[in-house]
Design a protein with these regions (language model features):
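Glycine-rich hexapeptide-repeat left-handed beta-helix
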Residues: 2-114
């Protein structure tokens, strides 16, 4: 719903993707979702290395760069940004910004890809 999907995006297995942008060849593992409304119903804020960006809207999911791999059962919280060529481990709960060429492990640990 209200999604921009670039070429060859894969959202194949029991996913919910709302109010989000998924880059070229991004892949959502089985059961992974983009949460697009905050639990407190406040406006969504996108966080970046440069600071916070006020969206001014209540519904905003996630932005995934090109060739991002999202593991099974992952929740991408409202306003999450995942840089190109990054991997998200299964069963993660992602908040905020994940740099390009990174691996997001459980509990928010982010390491650079080799």
């Amino acid at each position: 719903k209200n999604v921009v999907l670039f070429n060859t995006v894969q959202v194949p297995h029991y996913n919910y993707v709302g109010d989000s942008v998924l880059g070229y060849k991004a892949h959502m593992g089985a059961g992974s979702i983009t949460s697009n409304v905050k639990s407190d119903k406040k406006l969504v804020v996108v966080k970046s290395p440069e600071g916070q960006i006020e969206t001014g809207i209540k519904k905003f999911g996630a932005m995934l760069g090109d060739e991002v791999e999202v593991g099974c059962g992952t929740v991408l919280n409202p306003g999450s940004v995942v840089g190109s060529h990054s991997n998200i481990y299964p069963l993660s709960s992602v908040r905020g910004f994940v740099p390009a060429n990174s691996i997001y492990k459980k509990q928010g640990e982010v390491v650079e890809k080799y």
